[in-house]
Design a protein with these regions (language model features):
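Ribokinase/PfkB-type carbohydrate-kinase core domain
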Residues: 1-238
């Protein structure tokens, strides 16, 4: 067994190379406590313990998938995630988050893509921004994009957070979603032109784009992320 979610996977990876982290969780149970890195500090907003397992179906390129009388052969490896996770849908924020951020060097934001109520989403974002006032002035704020159930919610999150983040990170599926077409990821000129369009839509200091071929940083002083990108690729491939 293992734990999922962007922040938890990051904490597990960081622990393997000797870096500590602190997590804001929305679900807690015996398995979460058992599988978290022992040195990882955490808070949890859940009023009671629950278990919401996510079913993840991974498939390889050209794998034959039979769905009733149809056969599907995907052009690239990918995955499908099925879940019914009420804690993620509600995304309660623990008021102790403000205190947790006092000494943060890097703050990763992710997880709003599962929310389904606009008023709740706006409330959570307002509370998040209040907590972020406690961040040190030199803290790096990193936003990891995701596939939103409601595309309008993606825009709401961006509009609220764009002025507060230094790095906006996304994968190729999300990248193509913003550009509105398929992109040849092996054509450097097409990728660059598409990144220029994306940067106009999402004017942040740096964009990190990670694909199944490569990862890159685009924007102000992008070279400063070269070692981090290489480390992420090595970690993801081992």
């Amino acid at each position: 067994n293992t734990l999922g979610g962007t922040s938890v996977r990051a904490a597990i990876a960081m622990s393997k190379i000797g870096y500590s982290s602190a997590l804001h969780l929305v679900t807690m149970n015996h398995d979460v406590r058992r599988l978290l890195p022992p040195e990882c500090e955490y808070i949890c907003s859940a009023p009671e313990e629950n278990s919401y397992p996510h079913l993840i179906i991974q498939f390889t390129q050209n794998h034959t998938i039979r769905v009733q009388d149809k056969i599907i052969r995907p052009k690239q490896a990918n995955r499908i995630i099925y879940d019914n996770d009420l804690d993620n849908i509600l995304m309660r924020l623990d008021p102790r988050l403000s205190q947790l951020l006092l000494n943060a060097k890097v703050f990763l934001i992710s997880g709003f893509n599962a929310m389904q109520d606009q008023s709740l989403l706006e409330d959570r974002l307002e509370k998040l921004l209040i907590s972020m006032e406690n961040l040190p002035k030199d803290a790096l704020v990193f936003y990891e994009d995701a596939c939103f159930y409601n595309k309008d919610f993606s825009r709401i999150v961006r509009d609220k957070l764009l002025g507060h983040i230094q790095i906006f990170s996304l994968n190729e599926d999300e990248f193509e979603g913003y550009i509105g077409r398929k992109i040849n990821l092996l054509d450097p000129l097409e990728v660059l032109q598409s990144l220029e369009i994306l940067h106009e839509l999402i004017p942040v200091p740096k964009i990190v784009l990670h694909t199944h071929y490569w990862a890159l940083a685009y924007g102000q002083n992008a070279d400063s992320l070269k070692k981090a990108l290489k480390g992420g690729i090595n970690m993801g491939g081992t």
